[in-house]
């Protein structure tokens, strides 16, 4: 029985970081949950001269989720999540706020919130952003328009299409201009939408977003708008998780040399199996091709692979609170392509131990 319970709990823990949250307050319709994890991790990289470099990448992550029952139909909610880098000396100021938002939910009419939250375009990328250590980096990233965690987003979400169609969900999002930062983190006004449908273990999602580029971003001559579209599908049942995603971006994806790619074509895939005794092996593939790029030497109009790797790894869950993991990244990026984008070509190996609650 313990093995069967573990097999059901682990997928939920992977998808939702707060699935194992500790309830710290629940009274008079107000509830507060506290969740987090402490991760001890080290990563080794194989350099071009066959030497190995390694670094500590340990961190801690904590969050609070609150809910207030205003009426029988109206609920207020909020969430805060914070990350602490444990690999640097004291006083290095490596902390960062991942999420901070608040909103209202009215029964089957849906929810509305505002703050720092996940961009709706990430709904498609989330299907394959499930690898052990790496993954989810073909086009999605934080503070890159509405492709990941980002600032100043107003989000409306509706589940089961107003209660009329089980499993049919949609979201609409607006992002205000953020220009008081480095050019690669800026964005103009924009909107995003996503639609997903889930039935009997299968899931399908489509997402699209379009944003104005700031004047500083548009100075590269690629255009005044940035956009992405993506489609993904998954199967999540019978201890199996398998997913694929394809997406394209325009004037949005940032290269390692801090230029924007005029266009990218991206593919990700992952398959995992959850054994009853706690082992969860994983195999993933991530690929991104850039079109009409700025090369490192300043030339424009070059095509090159941006990302190309296979990850093989596994978790072992002792229980719902404790696990260890390891992963190896086989970097397939050609050195000629890497020379254009200034991307790394090293293989990498990661090992870690996690306590989560």
Swiss-Prot record:
GO BP, sorted A to Z: monoatomic ion transmembrane transport
Signal peptide: 1-21
SUPFAM superfamilies given in the database record: Porins
GO cellular component: cell outer membrane; pore complex
InterPro entries: Gram-neg_bact_OMP (IPR050298), Gram_neg_porin_domain (IPR033900), Porin_dom_sf (IPR023614), Porin_gammaproteobac (IPR001897), Porin_Gram-ve (IPR001702)
Keywords: Cell outer membrane, Ion transport, Membrane, Porin, Signal, Transmembrane, Transmembrane beta strand, Transport
Induction or repression: Expression induced by marR.
Segments passing through the bilayer: none
Subcellular location(s) of the protein: Cell outer membrane
Membrane topology, as annotated: Multi-pass membrane protein
GO molecular function annotations of the record: porin activity
Principal subcellular localisation of the protein: membrane
Keyword Repeat included in the entry's annotation: no
UniProt key word Flavoprotein: no
Function noted in UniProt: Forms pores that allow passive diffusion of small molecules across the outer membrane. Plays a role in resistance to carbapenems; this carbapenem-resistant, noncarbapenemase-producing clinical isolate has a deletion in ompF and a mutated marR gene that does not induce expression of this protein. However if this gene is overexpressed, or if wild-type marR is introduced, this leads to decreased resistance to the carbapenem antibiotics ertapenem, imipenem and meropenem.
Similarity section: Belongs to the Gram-negative porin family.
Name of the protein this chain belongs to: Outer membrane protein YedS
């Amino acid at each position: 029985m313990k093995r069967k319970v573990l097999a059901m709990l682990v997928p939920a823990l992977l998808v939702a970081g707060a699935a194992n949250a500790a309830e710290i307050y629940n009274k008079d319709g107000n509830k507060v949950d506290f969740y987090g994890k402490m991760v001890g991790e080290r990563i080794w990289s194989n350099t071009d001269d066959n030497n190995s470099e390694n670094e500590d990448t340990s961190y801690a992550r904590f969050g609070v989720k609150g809910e207030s029952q205003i009426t029988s139909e109206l609920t207020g909610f909020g969430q805060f999540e914070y990350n602490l880098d444990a690999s640097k000396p004291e006083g290095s100021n490596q902390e960062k706020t991942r999420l901070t938002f608040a909103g209202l939910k009215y029964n089957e009419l849906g929810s509305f919130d505002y703050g720092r939250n996940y961009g709706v375009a990430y709904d498609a990328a989330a299907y394959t952003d499930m690898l052990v250590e790496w993954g989810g980096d073909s086009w999605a990233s934080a503070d890159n328009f509405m492709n990941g965690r980002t600032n100043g987003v107003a989000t409306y979400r509706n589940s089961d299409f107003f209660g009329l169609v089980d499993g049919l969900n949609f979201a609409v999002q607006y992002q205000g201009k953020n220009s008081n930062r480095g050019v690669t983190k800026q964005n103009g006004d924009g909107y995003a939408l996503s639609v997903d449908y889930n039935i009997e273990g299968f899931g399908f999602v489509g997402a699209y977003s379009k944003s104005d580029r700031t004047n500083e971003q548009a100075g590269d001559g690629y255009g005044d708008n940035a956009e992405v579209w993506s489609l993904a599908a998954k199967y999540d049942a019978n201890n199996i998780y398998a997913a694929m995603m394809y997406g394209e971006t325009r004037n949005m994806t940032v290269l390692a040399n801090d230029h924007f790619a005029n266009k990218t074509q991206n593919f990700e895939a992952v398959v995992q199996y959850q054994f009853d005794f706690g082992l969860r092996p994983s195999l993933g593939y991530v690929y991104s091709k850039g079109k009409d790029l700025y090369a490192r030497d300043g030339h424009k109009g070059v095509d090159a692979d941006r990302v190309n790797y296979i990850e093989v790894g596994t978790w072992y869950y002792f229980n719902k609170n404790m696990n260890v993991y390891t992963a190896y990244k086989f970097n397939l990026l050609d050195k000629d392509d890497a020379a254009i984008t200034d991307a790394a070509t090293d293989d990498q190996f990661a090992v870690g131990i996690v306590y989560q609650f």
